[in-house]
Amino acid sequence: MITNAALIPIRNSSTRLPNKSLKKIKNNLRSIDIVIERAKKTNFFVILTTSTESSDDVLVDIAKEHSIAIFRGSLNNKIKRWYDCLKTFEIQNALIVDGDDLCFDYDIGIRSIQQLTSSSSELITHTKNIVPGFFTYAMT
């Protein structure tokens, strides 16, 4: 059983900007590299959650590069992918870090899991005083 995990849902088949996670921000630094490194700062078990589509095969290699876990599931049903990942890895608490969220604040993520585990809540979302994009969801 994994007590706390950071799930990074991402896929490359976006219609608005395909392969956006692979876009280079500076030199050879891809946007997904930034998100993964920020998620690792939580010290939670980090899992890249993607689809079983061939367009997402490259994400398996990226997970290996960063020494994080990979989970492959539904392409179009992100919530099912989360659920299946939670069940497969037997995760007690999960922090969702959007794969294109370069501004994710890992400290807020850590505090959200702390709040989640110290209360009877099942879901925590951002409050009005936190800019959306710095934090998404924590759930048990």
Feature names for model-found ranges:
Residues 82-86, 90-102:
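Short beta-strand-to-loop acidic/aromatic patch adjacent to the donor-nucleotide binding site
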Residues 61, 104-140:
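Conserved core of the sugar-phosphate nucleotidyltransferase
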Residues 51-56:
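A conserved acidic beta->alpha catalytic loop
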Residues 1-18:
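N-terminal nucleotide-binding beta1-loop-alpha1 segment
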Residues 43, 91, 118-122:
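Short, high-confidence coil segments that cap the C-terminus of an alpha-helix
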Residues 3-8, 32, 45-48:
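Hydrophobic targeting segments
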Residues 30-46, 61, 65-66:
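A short, N-terminal amphipathic alpha-helix
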Residues 64-77, 87:
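Conserved donor nucleotide-binding strand/loop of the catalytic core
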